[in-house]
Every structure is written in C-alpha cells, then in structure tokens.
Amino acid sequence: MAGNTFGRALRLTTFGESHGPGLGGIIDGCPAGLELTEAHIQAELDRRKPGQGPTATKRKEADTVRLLSGVFEGCTTGTPIAFFIANEDQRSRDYGNLAEAFRPGHADWAYFQKYNGLRDHRGGGRSSGRETAARVAGGVIAKKILARRGVTILGGCVELGGIAAPLWGLDMDGAAARPYCAAAPSVVSQWDALVAEARKAGETLGGIVRIEAHNVPAGLGEPVFDKLDAVLAHAVMSVGAVKGVEVGEGFAAAALRGSQNNDPLLPADAPEPGRARFASNHAGGILGGISSGQDIVLRVAVKPIASIAVTQKTVDRQGQPVDILIGGRHDLSAIPRIVPVLEAMTALALADALLLQQRMGLGL
C-alpha cells in the first residue's frame, strides 16, 4: 500500500492495523542531539489513548510506546527512530458480521474496490483511527525540533455537534485540561447535554478543531506546488475523520472585501530593514504559501464517527441488500482524541518545512 509516508526532510512512515499485533512508525531525518525518551512520547499518547472522557470508546489500550532505535542515552543519534505500540484490548469477534457487509460511512467499500476484494474487516484494519497513535508519537519528535526555534502548537475544540464556543472567550492555553479539549470553558455544560442526548439516541457527533502555531519564523514553505498552507492541508486532511480545513479566515474570506481581508503592515516597534508587524491576521500566518512570521491558525472540520448504534441499510459482497447494526466499542465523537493528532500533523509539516529551509541554506 503506497501513501504511508509523510514529509521530505523529516519523514514519518507508519504501519499496523487496529486488530493486529500493534502499530508503529519510523522517523527519518531527525537531527542528532534532541532529548527524547519513551516518557516524552507517552505523555502525548496518553492524551489520545482510548477509554477516557465522555465521548471515548470503552476499548482500553495502555498505548505503551517502545523506542526501538535512533536514541542512545536519552538523545537522538541522527539515525532512523523506530517505535512500536502494542494492541492489547482488541475484540475481533465484535466484527464477525462485517466480513461480508460494508459499513456506511466507513472505508470498507472503497478498500474492497481498491484492493481487489481484500480487506481487514476487524475494526477497519489500516483505515481505523487507531493508526493515528503512530502519528502522535512521530509528532512528539517534530515538536521537539520546532521547540528549538521556540515554536509551540496548541489545539482545542471550538465546535461540537453544531454548538460553537464564543470566539471572544477562547482560551487555547487551557484547552488540553478541559473536557472535550474545549477552547472555551463556557461551552462545556452545553456539550455535556448534547453528548448525553446523542448517546441516548445511538448517534455520534462531529465538530471543529482550532490549531494555532506560535512563533513560526517567516520564510517557511515553497512558492508554488508546495505552499505551506497546501502542505498543512495535506497533513491534516490525511487524518481519516477530517473533511475540511481553513487557514486564517478561510471560507469566511469569500464574503469579505479586499480592504477587510488584507492585513496591513506596520513598522516594527524598533524599525529596521526586514522587520515589520501586522495590524491583523486574516491570512492565518501564511502569504503566498510562505509563513509571514505571524501565528498560523487552522480550523479543521471533523465528521461524526461513522459507527452508530442504529440499524442501517447496506449491501453485502454479493451486492444483496442487508440491514446491519454495528457492534464493538466506538467513540461517540473523534473529539477530543483527534486534537493531539492534528497537533502532531501540524508539527510534522512545520518541522519538515523548517528542515527543508535549513537544507537549502536559506537561514533559520
């Protein structure tokens, strides 16, 4: 299967399936000398792991990571970094009835068509959201590369099931500690009621996640086919539940006039050649596909989980109509577990762009 590797200077390859022995990845291109331990990776994996929070699946996975190579005495060596995360609580018997039928909203039908009728029906196999654990592990390394330049990445949920957090009340710094990774504390009680209602109805919920990257240096990204916003969109759209991404004002910019959407440049506090500041950030930190030095701001649309506790119509392998009720243990929403995944993919894209810029000898 092609398409398992992301990046050019910093490359992450992931492997594994939802109900196989485990999953993992290899990071190639990481500089030597970064402090890295299993505990560093585990802290981020614990944010994503199943079995915690009001919307999470009841599947219990420790998601304990093992570093297999590329690290010596707590530091990266510059060689490929391999890691592995065992699957410990898979229940494949829950999926026996899905060997012959295709689940609506899942990748079952598309995989069946692409791979000549061969697919792992147990929990979706390679298409399962469980694959994203390896992305989170790789993202830890990318975040460490960025931290050397003072770059930080924050994520938080700004909308769940159509109920949006007030833009004026966002507190991204505290999002990770709140239920749903909520970017505003005022909306949590409304989301609690919505989740209870959806659970009673056997339904699932989608939402919108906001990602911010702070202290990103100006000059990252390439001017044509590898624009930084295009690479970031590629990164986050590769996550299975993601259906859309906005940079800065995004689709709202279509309703603005140029005078409203432009970000005026102002002299820096201490004016000098090559320095300026902006009066606003409608562009989301990217101009002409290249970082401007402002915060990069993304809004990511996350679809409802396709596994619902409601009988659905579908067809079997012979094309005959059947009704299915999906068993197993499933999230009520990809939120909040998807937040560290989106942070990781943003970090991988930015770290890759940073290393490419350095490789080209263009400063930074």
UniProtKB/Swiss-Prot annotation:
Pathway of action: Metabolic intermediate biosynthesis; chorismate biosynthesis; chorismate from D-erythrose 4-phosphate and phosphoenolpyruvate: step 7/7
Presence of the UniProt keyword Amino-acid biosynthesis in the record: yes
PROSITE patterns: CHORISMATE_SYNTHASE_1 (PS00787), CHORISMATE_SYNTHASE_2 (PS00788)
GO cellular component: cytosol
A GO molecular-function descriptor: FMN binding
Annotated residues for binding of NADP(+): 48
Superkingdom of the source species: Bacteria
Keyword terms of this UniProt record: Amino-acid biosynthesis, Aromatic amino acid biosynthesis, FAD, Flavoprotein, FMN, Lyase, NADP
Pfam families: Chorismate_synt (PF01264)
NCBIfam families documented for this protein: aroC, PRK05382.1
Assembly and binders: Homotetramer.
Protein known as: Chorismate synthase
